[in-house]
């Protein structure tokens, strides 16, 4: 589709003055080959693994939670109320607990009750930095998860921090290329991107923004209202896990699954972020090459790093400054030939 809005959208103010501008870092819980969503028996106990979603945790959350519920149903007679432990209080644990709690007695155990990886996520709905098997069955499962997740996010709306957005790109998106067309249709093809200085040809993908501070707070509040309050617990070994009194255990420990369940396929991928002050009127998303900009109600989130096998939640001020400069240059219409020399940039992945 060839399209052009004609209107010029406002560009961000990239002024970074503390304390309103904050540098952050998050570690994506990436898994080689595919995310893990399956049952692993341990004697009389069953662990349902739900981890390895990389940068797509919020995106896939409801779909994976729905899949977890279906796996639980295979373990118990129909209509039986079970005692279920959920490990992890990030988005995967919270959404799984939310769907399980109406029909089961759910307890959440986590080493972090807040301040999880999900809390520093950007929030665009797109399956980024996540793998799945190439088989037809695995592709179908992945696409079904995306369909369910998108539908459940969209149906919850603003009270869960969800709003429709157009994501503008210079080139076709690899992440959106994984999404079935009945979920996110083919992008609008634009003669010019709709910004004052960023006017190259591009595309517009109709997707969602899921704002983590609103979404996660709502999940936690709703669970607490139903009597499900996460408990602090540190698990160092599988024996610690299967020592729980619950016989069904949902493992949503993300990156921690690598050491806890001896999974060598789990790899940390650190991303640097700059949180600028919130700015009214920026009702769009942008992601291409070395930078992405996600305006939200709490911050304008600027990112673009991909540090493979780096597990460090301490922001790197130099890299954050680079990311901010690149985003500023993009929206000023400036090109930068030297960017490819930096291997940690998102554009190289």
Predicted regions, residues:
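Helical element adjacent to the flavin cofactor pocket in flavoenzyme catalytic cores
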Residues: 62-72, 197-236, 242-246, 252
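A catalytic-pocket lid/entrance helix-loop region that shapes and gates access to the active site
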Residues: 128-134
């Amino acid at each position: 589709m060839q399209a052009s809005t004609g209107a010029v959208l406002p560009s961000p103010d990239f002024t970074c003055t503390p304390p309103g501008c904050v540098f952050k870092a998050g570690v994506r819980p990436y898994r080689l080959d595919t995310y893990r969503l399956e049952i692993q028996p341990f004697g009389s106990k069953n662990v349902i693994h739900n981890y390895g979603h990389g940068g797509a945790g919020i995106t896939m959350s409801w779909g994976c939670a729905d899949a977890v519920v279906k796996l639980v149903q295979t373990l118990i007679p129909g209509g039986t109320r079970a005692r279920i432990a959920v490990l992890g209080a990030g988005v995967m644990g919270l959404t799984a607990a939310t769907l399980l709690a109406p029909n089961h007695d759910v307890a959440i155990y986590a080493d972090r009750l807040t301040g999880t990886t999900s809390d520093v996520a950007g929030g665009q709905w797109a399956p980024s930095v996540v793998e799945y098997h190439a088989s037809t069955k695995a592709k179908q499962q992945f696409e079904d998860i995306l369909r369910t997740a998108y539908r459940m996010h969209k149906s919850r709306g603003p009270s869960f921090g969800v709003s429709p957005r157009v994501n503008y790109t210079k080139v076709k998106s690899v992440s959106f290329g994984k999404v079935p067309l009945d979920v996110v249709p083919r992008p609008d093809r634009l003669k010019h991107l709709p910004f004052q200085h960023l006017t190259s040809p591009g595309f517009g993908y109709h997707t969602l923004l899921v704002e983590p501070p609103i979404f996660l707070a709502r999940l936690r509040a709703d669970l607490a209202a139903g009597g499900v309050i996460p408990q602090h617990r540190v698990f160092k070994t599988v024996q610690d896990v299967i020592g729980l009194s619950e016989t069904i255990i949902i493992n949503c420990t993300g990156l921690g699954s690598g050491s806890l369940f001896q999974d060598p396929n789990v790899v940390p991928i650190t991303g640097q972020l700059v949180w600028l002050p919130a700015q009214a009127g920026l009702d769009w998303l942008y992601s291409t090459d070395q930078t992405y900009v996600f305006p939200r109600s709490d911050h304008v989130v600027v990112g673009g790093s991909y540090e493979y096998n780096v597990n460090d939640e301490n922001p790197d001020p130099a890299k954050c400054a680079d990311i901010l400069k690149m985003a500023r240059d993009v929206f000023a219409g400036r090109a930068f030939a030297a960017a490819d020399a930096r291997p940690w940039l998102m554009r190289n992945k």
